[in-house]
Design a protein with these regions (language model features):
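Short, small-residue-biased leader/transition segments that mark boundaries at the very start
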Residues: 3-8
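Active-site rim loops that border cofactor/substrate pockets in soluble metabolic enzymes
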Residues: 23-76, 82, 92
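Conserved acidic residues
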Residues: 75, 95, 116
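General beta-strand structural signal in soluble alpha/beta enzymes
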Residues: 13-17, 78-79, 99, 118-120
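Short, T/G/N/S-enriched strand-turn elements that build extracellular solenoid repeat scaffolds
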Residues: 87-91
Length: 174
């Protein structure tokens, strides 16, 4: 697979999946441990309502600052923006955020928090970056397909339509 975790597997990294997804104060430091926990918990979690683990609707706007130390001790914070926004402290000076589904208002909030760089994994269109699933659906529609495409087909269309990530310098690093 070519997920965000694979990008960081050779770096010093802490995965916050248990911390922010399940409120279990246990950072994971390798893809192997992430895989082990996923194998253990996925059979149970997939039978429960998504809303128990993921902010839906108005819950996406509700902030609950939690586990601040993990935000502050990492230079790069990567993941789902709904989780980042929900749990982040008010100040993240000099941090780099890698995410998507960011609006213009979210960018301003990150600027006010002191975030130095925002990288979205999908392009910014009309002031917001969309989720990867939205971009995948767009590519499937552009291809005229009624099913998911192969990795090669996605890459071909990404090149054809010049779809790129976005990097914004929000604040000078303190």
């Amino acid at each position: 697979s070519r997920g965000l975790g694979d990008v960081y597997k050779r770096q010093e990294v802490s995965f916050g999946d248990l911390i922010f997804g399940l409120n279990i104060d246990k950072p994971l430091y390798s893809l192997k441990s992430l895989g082990w926990w996923a194998e253990l918990l996925a059979p149970l979690i997939t039978k429960l309502p998504v809303s128990w683990f993921y902010p839906m609707g108005k819950q996406q706007e509700k902030r609950t600052v939690r586990h601040t130390k993990y935000f502050l001790e990492n230079d790069i914070i990567a993941g789902d923006f709904h989780f980042i926004k929900k749990f982040m402290p008010d100040k993240l000076p000099g941090k780099i955020i890698i995410t998507n589904t960011v609006t213009a208002a979210d960018r301003e909030m990150l600027r006010q928090a002191g975030v130095s760089i925002l990288i979205t994994t999908t392009p910014c269109l009309e002031g917001r970056s969309f989720g990867t699933n939205v971009m995948e659906a767009l590519l499937v529609a552009l291809k005229g397909s009624n099913k998911a495409l192969s990795a090669e087909e996605y890459l071909e269309l990404i090149e054809q339509y010049h779809i790129e990530s976005s990097t914004e310098y929000l604040c000078a690093k303190e």
